[in-house]
UniProtKB/Swiss-Prot annotation:
One of its GO terms (molecular function) is ATP binding. Acts as a chaperone. The modification Phosphothreonine is found at T199. Residues 605-619 have a biased composition (Low complexity). It comes from Stutzerimonas stutzeri (strain A1501) (Pseudomonas stutzeri). This is Chaperone protein DnaK.
Amino acid sequence: MGKIIGIDLGTTNSCVSIMENGNVKVIENAEGGRTTPSIIAYTNDGETLVGQSAKRQAVTNPQNTLYAVKRLIGRRFEEDVVQKDIKMVPYTIVKADNGDAWVEVKGQKMAPPQISAEVLKKMKKTAEDYLGEPVTEAVITVPAYFNDSQRQATKDAGRIAGLDVKRIINEPTAAALAYGMDKAKGDHTVIVYDLGGGTFDVSVIEIAEVDGEHQFEVLATNGDTFLGGEDFDIRLIDYLVDEFKKETGMNLKGDPLAMQRLKEAAEKAKIELSSSQQTDVNLPYITADASGPKHLNVKISRAKLESLVEDLVERTIEPCRIALKDAGIDVSKINDVILVGGQTRMPLVQQKVAEFFGKEARKDVNPDEAVAMGAAIQGAVLAGDVKDVLLLDVSPLTLGIETLGGVMTPLIEKNTTIPTKKSQVFSTADDNQSAVTIHVLQGERKQAAQNKSLGRFDLAEIPPAPRGMPQIEVTFDIDANGILHVSAKDKATGKQQSIVIKANSGLSEEEIEQMVRDAEANAEEDRKFEELATARNQGDQLVHATRKMLTEAGDKASDDDKAAIEKALSELELAIKGDDKAAIEAKIAAVSQASTPVAQKMYAEQAQAGEGQPAGEQAKPGDDVVDAEFEEVKDNK
């Protein structure tokens, strides 16, 4: 069986890890980075770029460069957070036929799982290049506060990328695994505060020794799936736009290229202000008007940035309070605070967390890599390579059904340890009612309409009976991925109806299979393109080497030889400009054949010259060896 890799599919950056010989290793990508930007770009010549290469060209191609797509995964177009996102990003967010939020690139509508799959494919390839073997299985992390639709959509993204997702686990839980694996035996309670690029989670986790097993039990979790580093960037961008407007009277918000440059500059400034007190944002030629080009130059202090984002940091404290309350634990009982996510490097975040929990956060956990490392550990547990770890996670939100009067009746309360199964008996609301609709909901509100609708299905052919008489048993079953299976059974007839919740939207099986086929076709195209590029490079190198050889050969090459070689080289150069790999390879062979007589002649002459070398010169290396041996003997005395 192949390795199960661990992937942190992040809003801003992604990371892949593997467990080898009992140690967890973060795998570097082809560019040498330990994390990969979760950015996908579609270029004008039909190429799909992922990661650093996509980020580099974003300024010149903002409408077709997609970032922070994780914030759209499993979401409806009408949701407030999506409407807010539409105003913030340069690419186009559209309403899919099923009501989901999709993106449109070059006139083509694409589902967020399809785009996230491109990042997962890059992670998969990174692992395969390192391991030297195909990778088909993965553990993928999601924010703890992701709802059912978002978890399902993440699993779909894995399938489209050609991965069998063995488990979806929560990011804070994964970070706790990475932190707790090498800690001394004994019980302790930790807080994982995870403020990433697009989402915020906090989990209270108890790490205990139970019968020799390392047990990680999530006691409670809370969060906000639309709060993260991207929001901090937006505050800074808005400030820079306002400052520029005050100075020049020009609004940069209508200029996608200027806004993309601002986004990059704001992100860079934010990072710099974590280690310095002041920085300059200097963007020459940001725009122009009739009077000429305009430049943006704004000084920003750390204090100014903190004043812009203070309320965002404050927003993270309330979920911490709720999580502690739900866990039934006093803040004084917390042994360690672990910070995860790049945004936690901000001094203000660290200060507020320390104030609330009454202790400094640990500095020995890498906020960018801990989540992927935890996923790799979970992968090793599932593969049977790690035996003494037990992970007990929870369902982050209450699950229930809509009952008479538009009320949500809970079946599984939030923070219930998963996997879990709960049943409850309901009945009909009217006499002789022949069918009931089971409307599945997720959320904490009493009114059904205020919660997230996960799906609905009908149980039909109920025998006629007075209202309240039929007994309909509804069963909720949450698997270890946090994905819900619901069934309804008429106890009188034994008739049963069940569904795996796929949300009332989501991707259909046909759509996923089509996307898998498209991805496989693209992979074949990518392979062909790579082979063509390799052949072109070989051809270029041969042209250069052969021309160099001809120059060195001088009169040693006859005019006929030179003419034959030049003809073959011209034909190879022409083939390199084309797209036919076989033609390039044929012309490479022709150049090699044409240049062989000259190369052999030169080799023979070099060999003769070598034989005629004076003996004294050949003795020198021997002298050196004797000296070295002599010194070594002296050292050993």
